[in-house]
C-alpha cells in the first residue's frame, strides 16, 4: 500500500513475479512519494510501471481545471527537485515506464521539452497497447 505524504490518500501497488523466468514487474500507478520500501521494491524489479500522472505539482490549478495539487491527490509530480524524475535517477531498475498519464501532462506531446527530458533520463512513456516482455523462458 502506498500513502500520499500530504493527506490521507491511499493507493495500491503490485509486484508481479514470473516464476518461470524469475522476472519481476512492479506496478505503482499512484504514488505520493517514493519511500525506502518502495525504492527497494523498484531496485529488485526488472521493470517498473510508475505514476506519470502530472508533470508539475500545481498542474491542474495552474490550468484552471481544479484546486487540488498532484500530491494532494496522491501523485508525485515528475518535475522538481523532489519529483519522480529526480528520485528515479538513482534507481538502477533495467526498465522504467511512466503510466497513468493525465491528458494535461506535456510528456504526451511529441517533441515537447518535457517529453525529451523524460526520454533523456532513459525512462519510457507508456502508451495504449504497450506490450512488456519480461525475461526469457528456460
Report each predicted region and the residues it spans.
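Short, surface-exposed amphipathic charged segments that create phosphate/polyanion-binding patches used
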Residues: 136-138
Amino acid at each position: 500500500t502506498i500513502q500520499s505524504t500530504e493527506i490521507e490518500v491511499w493507493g495500491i501497488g503490485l509486484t508481479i513475479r514470473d516464476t518461470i523466468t524469475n522476472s519481476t514487474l512492479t506496478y505503482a500507478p499512484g504514488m505520493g512519494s517514493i519511500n525506502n520500501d518502495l525504492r527497494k521494491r523498484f531496485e529488485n524489479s526488472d521493470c517498473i510501471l510508475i505514476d506519470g500522472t502530472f508533470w508539475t505539482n500545481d498542474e491542474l490549478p495552474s490550468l484552471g481545471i481544479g484546486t487540488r495539487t498532484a500530491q494532494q491527490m496522491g501523485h508525485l509530480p515528475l518535475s522538481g527537485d523532489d519529483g519522480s524524475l529526480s528520485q528515479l535517477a538513482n534507481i538502477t531498475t533495467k526498465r522504467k515506464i511512466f503510466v497513468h498519464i493525465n491528458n494535461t501532462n506535456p510528456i504526451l506531446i511529441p517533441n515537447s521539452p518535457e517529453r525529451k527530458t523524460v526520454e533523456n533520463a532513459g525512462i519510457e512513456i507508456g502508451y495504449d497497447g504497450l506490450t512488456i516482455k519480461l525475461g526469457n523462458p528456460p
